[in-house]
Structures are given as structure tokens and as C-alpha cells.
Amino acid sequence: EFTPNSIKTNIDSSLRFLLNVIQKKAIVFLLSDFIDDNYEKSLKIASKKFDLTGIRIYDIKETEIPKIGIVPIIDAESGKLEWVDTNSKKVRHNYKTNYDRNIKKFHSLFKKNGAGIIDCRVDESYVKKLLGYFKLRA
């Protein structure tokens, strides 16, 4: 069973580890929600060295905040607790804007560096997604 060392996403650290450990050309699949910063440099290097594909795993429920009133929200990565009014249009708009910005960043960084992209919801068949991806590349 896999147990993460940390709840914080650190794509840069993962890519740097990969660059140090794997010396030959390889096909690499990087699975993440890609809600992270500061991995541009290591992504650029890794995408030149490897046949790299980013697989963004996401839950459709995470794309928007439902209107359920004032709720405590703990940032899973920082551990910070905040009370948030989910009925607020501004709160929901800011959340959606930030979420969409992360997705666009992932797509633009991977495209810019010539890396492959797969988006896969947690309730979808990853096998179908991979087969479709390989058919497009063939």
C-alpha cells in the first residue's frame, strides 16, 4: 500500500528526483492534480530528456464550491483553517477562477514543453483515456 510522505503536492521535487535517478530516455507518466507552483524549470528539462505525459486526475466535485453556507475549510497542503461563506458569489467566483487558472497553467506548460496531456476524472476509466491517447499519438 502506498502512503504519501506529505499531503502537499510537490511536482518539482518529483521531477528532480526522476531526472537524477533515470539516466536513459524513458516514457514517463506524471500523475497529479497539478495544483502546484514552481515546477516550470524541472518540467522543461524533464520534457526534453523523457517522453513525458502529464495525467491530471481530478474530481468533478472539486471544480466548484456548492452553496452550503458558512463552513470551515482546511487547506490540505498548508493545514490552515478558514471559515468561508460558500453562499458568497465572490467566494465561489474566486474559487472557480483559481481552479480554472491551475488547469490552464497545466495545459499551457505541458504544451509549451512538448509534453503529452491527459485529463482523467476519478470516475472515468483511465484505460479508455490511455487507449485514446495512444491512438492519437500513433
Q: Where do the language-model regions lie?
A:
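Von Willebrand factor
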Residues: E1-A26, D36-N38, Y58-D59
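Von Willebrand factor type A / integrin I
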Residues: F17-K24, K44-A138
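Domain-scale detector for complete catalytic domains at protein termini or as standalone homologs
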Residues: V28-S32, A115
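Active-site glycine- and acidic-residue-rich loops that bind
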Residues: L31-D37, L52
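Short, well-ordered alpha-helical microsegments
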Residues: D37-E40, V127
